[in-house]
Amino acid sequence: MEDWVSCRSEEQKRCEEKGQSTFDESEEEQWRRLKEEAMIDSDDSEGAAGDEGAVVLAEAKRRKPRKSGKVIATQKCAQPQNQHRHQQKLTKSLSTYDMENLLKQYRNISAEEEDEVDVDITKFLQDDGVDSEDGEGPSVTATELLSSLISGRSADTNKTEELADSFPLANLNDEVFTYENEAAVKKTPRNKEKRTNKSGANYVIKETVVEELNVVTDLAEVRTGSQHASTDFLNGCPPKALFYWFDAKEQPHTLTAPGTILLFGKVCMNEEDEEFRSCCVRIQHVHRNVFLLPKEGSTDAEVVQEINAICRGSGIEERRIKFVERYYAFEEPGVPREKNRWAKLVYPGRYPPFPNKGGLTHVQVVVGASRSLLELFLIKKRLMGPSYLEIEHLVTAMDRVSHCKTEFLVPSPKDIKVYNSSKPPPPFTVASIQLHAQLDSDGVKNEVIAASIALYGDVSIDGERKPNITECFTGVRQLSPDAPLPLDLETYCLSKRMPGVHRFINERALLTWFAETLAALDPDIIVGHNIIGYTVETLLNRYQELNIVRWSTIGRLDVRRFPRIQGNNFNLAIEKEACVGRLVVDTYLLAREYYKSTNYKLLSLSTQMEIKGITDNRGHFEPGSTVLVKDSMMSSEALCPILLQLLNCAVLSFNVASFLDVIPLTKRLTLLAGNLWSRTLYGARSERIEYLLLHAFHNLKFVTPDKKKRDLKRGREDDDDEGKRKTKYQGGMVLEPKSGLYSEYILLLDFNSLYPSLIQEFNVCYTTIDRDENTVSAEVPPPESLICLSCRAAGLPSPCLHKCILPKVIRGLVDSRREIKRMMKSEKDPGNLAMLEIRQLALKLTANSMYGCLGFEYSRFYAQPLAELVTRQGRLALQNTVELIPQISPSIRVIYGDTDSVMIQTGIKDDIVKVRNLGFEIKGKVNQRYQSLELDIDGVFRAMLLLRKKKYAALSVVDWQGEGKVYKREVKGLDMVRRDWCPLSQHVSDAVLKRILNAEGGEDILDFVIKYMKGVAQDVRSGNVYPLEEFVISKSLTKEPESYHGTGYPHAVVALRMKQRKEGVRVGDLIPYVICEGDEHIDDKAYHIDEVRRSDGLSVDVEWYLSSQLYPPVMRLCEHIQGFVPEQLSEAMCIASHMRTERDVKEEDTANDFSHCSIFKSRALSECFPTATALQVQCTHCQLVVPVDPHKYINDMFSSREKPPPTAPFELYVCFNCGRSLPLAYLANCMTQMCHTIIRQFYCSGGNVASVRALRAQFTYLRAMFDVPQALNCPSAVKNAHRVLSLRCLGTDRKLYTLADVERFPDVEPVDPLLACAESFYRRIDHLFVSLDKLFDTP
């Protein structure tokens, strides 16, 4: 018998003799050759092979052979007959997929091995460790290896033992693999920047470096599932227990257990050992309370009779009615705002709510009919957020409704009492989860590919200590049945210090494991980035699609029936309902609430916060965005970094939550408000204030108003539509800024908590302001209104207990915060200091949100007259301060003011002490006028560039209370802080702004800007300086991409193409795109950055970027600097610009069609004027209606590569259909009629703001279309075509000239009659605006 090496060698020799290579054979021939080689030395008897069943090798580990110049000698050995049969059966059982992979390895022999005479094919079937330095060590033949793989044992025990260190054999039963240490062969990553471009690219191409992911955090080994089993370990039920509650749920009256409240928390099983277990407490026999105000003149018996009749009609069989005295002070019309006699109806919660249809005979108003049982329970039991409860009469629940480890029944709410103690809260278990889902093969549904869970035990919800990761779990499934996962995945990941990896054959198995794991871990808090709106929605959709039995383990309610959905997706309410019992920390929502950024993606946030996960770098995989393919999941080496990055994102989500301290902060906010902690985590700010006031008024025996129903038809709209919702009353005062560059010190003074302070200052409250339903503007309450009638009759002092409730609540918050800040000054321990900081921040956020309940239309405590009074007093306070400042010192002046702050130009250049003393003087004079309102120094600016309202940049003096030598730049409202400007635009603006603010004088600022921008423009056009990433623009999706209609949404067009490529696109995502060259609309020129990288024919539209991304922000930064002329900047950048009037600059803050039209290019005016109507005329020859567009006509002529540029006079206005000339007089007449029609429509519309904008945009569009020769930096070829080559024969003196006459009279400039017409109408729109500020000026 010959071995495989000799066969391969002879065959290669025969091919060399024929002058051809072995690898020139076809795939079929190579396949046949491999089969023949595998069958060498085996018997030809097919009967023996047919006696036994075929053995199918499902999957084998194939590793790339190590490059070596030495030949491995293969020993000859006689094979037994049974091994021959095994070899034959293996050959027949090889699948097409396995054989193709074998062929691929067959072809990929290194160049060094091709030159060798003897090549061993067994290298493709064994581990790298078979190589030895001298090449003479023991080896294993291919037949022995394949036979051992089938039988599960070694073919030669002695040989296997000798090769134990270098040649690990894989047993398919136990799947035990070993690997050599790769630390010694770690490659140094290359980080080069290529200066050469690919063909057609006009940007620097960066070589993408994929760094190896290494775990830098020790991850604990995963414990067995039995240790997490959720079994009830109680042998008996204690008479009472200490229970820490943090979430609750009301059972509606339509379910099997109506009128029940479920409390979720942790029960203390052993007070000595402080052992806590998750627990659900079901409170039975909860009652509803309804208050009914009898009409004047009705008797108690009549009221009771009418109430009983309504209850009998509604099926309320059990009820109690009694008459009580209660106060009322809110907006229900016809209800007196004093103490009154009310009828109180009490009945069990298992009955439906009391009907409140109005039109009752003896009852004037019904309050509390729509109030939920849970709200009533929290208010009546005075549960102020998560806390300990002492519960009596516990009964172990036999019919469990939750996934908690323990579950009890409580007969009555009276068995629950608040446990007043300073006992610290129990430790919590936190699970941070991260999914990777991508569209299926049809591009319709999101399917889960992998999921990771990072578990944190013993977490302090007060933020006393930072926890470490306890366990980690990661599950991954194969993409399709024909793409199995590598068998050694778990062992390989474990060798990379990543435990807890599990493989699954399909999505159903993966999700079943995920649901069971959550049930076993039983976390109290679930953390995730965009978990509400994406993760939970994806899980619920896939759970329902695949009918996962334990789908409800995402929460703690054991629900078997899936919720009903409308359409294809769950709404947010259903998602939150599914998570009841577990607190959900969505770092995306909370970061938007408590962290200011332009990009709220997880990886971007972690970079901004300088947060690290468990790896030393980020890798190339991004969960939810990167599309996984089969090739990336075929080997453990490729799949392990993906799973590691998935787990790393789960860890990063928890680290972001820890960085923001959202768990202790939201807990403290809940303790102040007395609402549900879960609702605070979802960002229900108005609800927090409502509960705070509900507790305050209920404790004083007030009847509180019901919730208002919101307009459910109002959906999610674009950001532009938000501005259409106008406030019903005037807000704060914003002074007109005195724009310019200031080099003297600027003093910034600010009222501390203006609106809460005004409420205290003027006793603004529901109980003190007289008003009715017709009151629009309320007045400051007089002193006699600060005491109620009953307290006045009792001789009590003013203000009484039942008045000024809102100011008292705010004063309590302010005083508490002041006390905590005093404690922080003396606190030395960092842990205690951090906890105090969280407490004071919670008090500040709550106090500042109190005003919102007055002006929010859908708040149950909405009172427009009170909100209007507060803002009016705020405007008066600011105005009085502005008037007082010049009286203190004539040399100072107010340059800007906004709601609660003023900026003062001090006139001082180099003495910070004088500036500080001036601020203290102004502060003292203003504060003498008020008791609760306080003006303070908010900051000092060393230099300031003030552009317009809410737009400025300044150098803030950090140590203004000291020497004043430390500066920090502060930017507000400028283009450079917005994400819809590319990084290059932001960097250029940053450099210009840095030079402006740091300049001693304005002499060389403009020279620097002109020179710098000229160099930038040259670098951009050269394409050899800036990489592609500098041109990426990012914009957020406010709705589904399919919901965008019309033009002007390039990010939506790019998002649609991303969805076609099965990339994950969700509402709220930032869509990156690049504008490339082309004559299409901007929507059609936008491409994803990956599309540009992959394409050789796409190039960045540098002219568009220069005119639309670089010029506008720099021009706006410099326009108020003395001596700046926009034309100088446009000439330096070699772009075309259009002169802007002073009125254009003033109206730039308002979004309209004219706001971005100061820059004109010689093409694509439709991009600048998307709403303008084009000029269309009927051809006098072919009778078709054709557009008139000289821009497009000339640019098409010069951009055409098929035709040479025109060299002889040609007609400019020709029909696009027949190509014949159109008469100039006829065109001018058509344009005049069109303009008259537009003006007539404008007057018919009433001349509103929208009509004015549309009219200006239309006439500016027409003027720009025919004004190309007048535009600066118009290309010489285009300008020559317009003015010389084309037949424009109307002179400036309104006389007709021929081209020859023009040459003889050079002073006579040819003028287009259409341009003259456009200019005449353009001047007429000036009469639409009257400057009233100079109307009464005297000369």
From Swiss-Prot:
Intervals of motif CysB motif: 1244-1274
Q: Which Pfam families match?
A: DNA_pol_B (PF00136), DNA_pol_B_exo1 (PF03104)
The family annotation for this protein states: Belongs to the DNA polymerase type-B family.
Protein name, as recorded? DNA polymerase alpha catalytic subunit
Q: Where is the composition biased (Basic and acidic residues)?
A: 8-19
Q: Which residues form a coiled coil?
A: none
Q: Which NCBIfam families match?
A: pol2
Q: List the disulfide bonds.
A: none
Its Enzyme Commission number(s) read 2.7.7.7
Q: What keywords are assigned to this protein?
A: DNA replication, DNA-binding, DNA-directed DNA polymerase, Metal-binding, Nucleotidyltransferase, Nucleus, Transferase, Zinc, Zinc-finger
Is this entry keyworded Cell wall biogenesis/degradation? Answer: no
Q: Gene3D superfamilies this protein is in?
A: 2.40.50.730, 3.30.70.2820, 6.10.10.100, DNA polymerase family B, C-terminal domain (1.10.132.60), Helix hairpin bin (1.10.287.690), Palm domain of DNA polymerase (3.90.1600.10), Ribonuclease H-like superfamily/Ribonuclease H (3.30.420.10)
Q: Which GO terms describe its molecular function?
A: chromatin binding; DNA replication origin binding; DNA-directed DNA polymerase activity; nucleotide binding; single-stranded DNA binding; zinc ion binding
Kindly give the InterPro entries that the UniProt entry links to this protein: DNA-dir_DNA_pol_B, DNA-dir_DNA_pol_B_CS, DNA-dir_DNA_pol_B_exonuc, DNA-dir_DNA_pol_B_multi_dom, DNA/RNA_pol_sf, DNA_pol_B_thumb, DNA_pol_palm_dom_sf, POLBc_alpha
Catalytic function, reaction form: DNA(n) + a 2'-deoxyribonucleoside 5'-triphosphate = DNA(n+1) + diphosphate
Per UniProt, Zn(2+) 1 binds at C1179, C1182, C1215, C1218
Task: Quote a single Gene Ontology cellular component term.
Answer: alpha DNA polymerase:primase complex
Kindly give any further remark recorded in the entry: In eukaryotes there are five DNA polymerases: alpha, beta, gamma, delta, and epsilon which are responsible for different reactions of DNA synthesis.
PROSITE patterns (UniProt xref): DNA_POLYMERASE_B (PS00116)
Described by its record, this protein's role is as follows: Polymerase alpha in a complex with DNA primase is a replicative polymerase.
Zinc fingers classed as CysA-type: ranges = 1179-1218
Which species expresses this protein natively?
Trypanosoma brucei brucei
Residues of the region (Disordered) are 1-29, 60-89
For this entry, list what GO says about its biological process.
lagging strand elongation; leading strand elongation; mitotic DNA replication initiation
Localization: Nucleus
| UniProt: Zn(2+) 2 binding residues | C1235, C1244, C1274, C1289
